[in-house]
């Protein structure tokens, strides 16, 4: 699969499509001292069965949404893994469909999360939103896939396995947790997540594509 992607034009071909449609900054500098535009503008797709042109998508609505708000400028949510149980608990209020609010519990990195997630003193319940910050490309060198958070053990025993997870880092692509990831700007450079505190109320609205601390 990786070789097919490379032979079809690879990342430069994808970025060229984004540049052509105004979806990425062409003047952003890269590691080779040239801009993204200089590196990728004009690159061609060699195999449209592997890389589809922007105007010929395989699917008009993909399994992701881009959110913004006062917590971050942009972040990605993988909506294709939202289970019926999760949708029923969070997204089925007829007076406020596709939106939910909850109390934030904030972890400064995966080490703190692993140390504290099962601590009853955090008072995590089924409506809590779990946050992990300091895990972006600058705050956590290597940008490892560490924003994988489960519910505390006492909720799992009650059959509640997934809570909303939000972070400025990455997560394994095999994770089934409904998560908002790659929040930018990240906390390490002064993004909104740096100001968030446990106990703050946060609202997520998938219709408006917003994530805001209240």
Language-model segments: what does each one mean?
Residues 1-187, 191-214:
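Catalytic or ion-coupling anion/metal-binding cores of large enzyme and transporter domains
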